[in-house]
């Protein structure tokens, strides 16, 4: 049986030699047996935890409240973050997330203007915490020449740190990590200790009703440099989480193997897990490809598994937006947001991007393909909601444009960071100005607890923003009337479904309708407009349309139904803007004028703010920078994307 397991591990791309796979199985079996022996103690500990939580007074909101957080955050535990100069620990990150002031990697003090409601620290599973031991000169690790060289580079300056921040992900992508990092005999004991420290820190800062510290990690699959990463988020506490070690891409780069691990975790512990893919925009066309990583066409079994384990998709983060692309959505004048520098290749630039790849990298096209799969074999692999996140590797939970803290410690606030070359390969360069100060995950839940927030994510009652706190409600139904806007929550939940929901089988004579309410970030820009993005299949053809459904001012639709620009108040000389245009709130009850009850469709809402400065403009003003690249965005329209509501005729 052990032989079959190891052969299977090899077959599915674990990249681990046979003797290591055997050792890995033995060690994991040993851990499992140890945990079984502690079942009674763990059960008592869990009971104590439940009793303790029950004594805490948690405010509940029956009609749900929006909670703001980050579902993608790295600290010094991640190898590429540590190699790039990050020394912020999970404890540092939690302290900043709850509003404390902390000196960061560059010695500058950071304090959030508004604390987070929740944080998922998602350090890379691959060598979890092991790179700290490389820095410490761990005797066993120093027997490897690559580890010794990295140890010396870690003692260098900024140039070495920038090189390591690129070299470590590349080593993972091309199976060139130091042997002790991939050898379970050396790696697992270090990872297990680091993981238990990580879960203990999460328990320390998790305060039900006040702040939620999720236990999470990132599975970092990057075959030949194509980004297929997933963030795995547990609903559970340390008692359950400590029964595992995070599943990594060193065991398998196949997401189906990750899902199998998640299923085994739930069966073993009674816990719950979900995964959030990200950066389809740099996946080399693999994120939503028509073939699995093993080369098989998608089928119903695959679709049902993916839909079960991956209810959300990260549409926005530091490495750009993955909603759509101008070459795919040619009639969408706002499709060019967050693409600068990211549509030229995959994560590592080992493979340059082609138009064919783009068809399988973005959320909107995945939604359309999902309708096609559902029609073909009765299941939709891409029935996911949308969220935003940061993917910061500094350990600093930053989101505001004028407080952008960089991707890595090497580009924390400093004059030259916008024009620095952060990656160069195959004749293509990526510059610092390609990074975006993003994003947020907003979740609707009855309370700020792990269980409530996780359940909100699972049911897709969540949305993403580019880093602004736009408050957005979306309900779909067939029985709404204008008066319902005055009681949108009661009417929305009572007569329809919220974002992430399903509507089926419209009654003859009734049109699908959506109640939408958007409120500006109180600390930022007014709202320009609300749009509904619709996709459907008609006579075998994939169709999409963007409708302007509510907007500020007295603008009128043109002959094509388009609304003119809202204007621009940004002063490029000092980085200021005013809210003399736009509106603080927009509401609408919108009926789809093209609704056909016989055609399946999806609808999601996009809310645009008025133009505002980017972090690049703030840097330009702050540091007196005279020259930036022509394609460096100085002004942008920040936005929010709701999770879709799906309509099915059956």
Model-derived regions: residue spans:
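C-terminal functional module detector
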Residues: 34-90, 94, 101-145, 149-151, ...
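Cap/lid and interdomain-hinge subdomains that line or gate substrate/regulatory clefts
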Residues: 165-171, 186-194, 227, 249-276
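Long, charge-dense tracts
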Residues: 233-234
């Amino acid at each position: 049986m052990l032989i079959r397991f190891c052969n299977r591990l090899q077959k599915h791309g674990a990249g681990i030699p046979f003797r290591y796979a055997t050792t890995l199985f033995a060690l994991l079996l040993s851990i499992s047996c140890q945990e079984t022996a502690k079942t009674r103690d763990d059960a008592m500990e869990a009971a104590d935890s439940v009793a303790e939580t029950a004594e805490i007074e948690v405010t509940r909101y029956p009609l749900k409240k929006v909670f703001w957080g980050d579902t993608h955050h790295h600290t010094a535990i991640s190898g590429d973050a540590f190699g790039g100069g990050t020394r912020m620990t999970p404890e540092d990150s939690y302290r900043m997330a709850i509003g404390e002031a902390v000196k960061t990697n560059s010695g500058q003090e950071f304090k959030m203007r508004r604390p987070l409601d929740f944080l998922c620290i998602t350090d890379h599973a691959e060598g979890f915490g092991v790179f700290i031991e490389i820095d410490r000169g761990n005797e066993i690790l120093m027997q490897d020449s690559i580890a010794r060289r990295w140890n010396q580079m870690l003692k260098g300056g900024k140039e070495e740190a920038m090189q390591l921040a690129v070299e470590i992900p590349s080593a993972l992508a091309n199976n060139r990590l130091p042997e002790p990092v991939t050898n379970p005999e050396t790696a697992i004991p270090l990872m297990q200790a680091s993981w238990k420290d990580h879960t203990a820190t999460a328990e320390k800062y998790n305060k039900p009703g006040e702040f939620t510290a999720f236990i999470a990690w990132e599975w970092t699959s990057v075959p030949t440099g194509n980004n297929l990463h997933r963030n795995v988020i547990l609903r559970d506490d340390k008692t359950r989480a400590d029964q595992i070690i995070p599943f990594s891409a060193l065991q398998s780069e196949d997401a189906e193997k990750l899902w199998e691990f998640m299923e085994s975790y739930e069966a073993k512990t009674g816990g719950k897990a979900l995964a959030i893919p990200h950066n389809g925009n740099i996946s080399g066309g693999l994120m939503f490809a028509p073939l699995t990583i093993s080369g098989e066409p998608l089928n119903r079994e695959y679709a049902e598994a993916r839909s079960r384990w991956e209810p959300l998709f990260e549409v926005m983060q530091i490495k750009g937006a993955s909603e759509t692309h101008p070459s795919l959505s040619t009639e969408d004048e706002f499709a060019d947001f967050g693409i600068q520098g990211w549509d030229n290749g995959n994560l590592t630039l080992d493979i340059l991007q082609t138009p064919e790849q783009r068809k399988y990298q973005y959320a909107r096209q995945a939604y359309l393909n999902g309708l096609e799969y559902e029609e073909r074999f009765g299941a939709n692999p891409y029935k996911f909601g949308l969220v935003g996140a940061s993917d910061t590797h500094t350990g600093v939970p930053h989101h505001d444009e004028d407080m952008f803290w960089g991707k890595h410690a090497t580009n924390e606030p400093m004059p030259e960071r916008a024009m620095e070359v952060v990656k160069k390969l195959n004749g293509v360069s990526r510059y610092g100005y390609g990074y975006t100060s993003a994003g947020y995950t907003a979740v609707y839940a009855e309370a700020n607890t792990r269980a409530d927030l996780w359940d909100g994510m699972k049911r897709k009652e969540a949305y993403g923003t580019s880093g602004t706190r736009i408050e957005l409600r979306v309900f779909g139904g067939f029985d709404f009337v204008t008066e319902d806007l005055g009681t949108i929550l009661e009417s929305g939940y009572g007569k329809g479904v919220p974002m992430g929901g399903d509507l089926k089988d419209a009654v003859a004579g009734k049109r699908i309708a959506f109640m939408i309410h958007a409120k500006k970030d109180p600390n930022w820009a007014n709202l320009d407009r609300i749009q509904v993005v619709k996709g459907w299949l008609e006579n075998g053809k994939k169709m999409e349309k963007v409708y302007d459904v509510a907007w500020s001012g007295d603008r009128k639709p043109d002959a094509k139904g388009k609304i003119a620009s809202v204007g621009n108040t940004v002063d490029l000389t000092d980085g200021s803007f005013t809210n003399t245009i736009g509106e603080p709130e927009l509401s609408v009850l919108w009926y789809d004028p093209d609704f056909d009850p016989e055609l399946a469709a999806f609808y999601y809402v996009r809310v645009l703010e008025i133009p505002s400065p980017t972090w690049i403009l703030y840097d330009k003003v702050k540091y007196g920078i005279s020259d930036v690249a022509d394609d460096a965005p100085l002004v942008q329209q920040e936005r929010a994307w709701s999770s879709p509501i799906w309509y099915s005729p059956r």
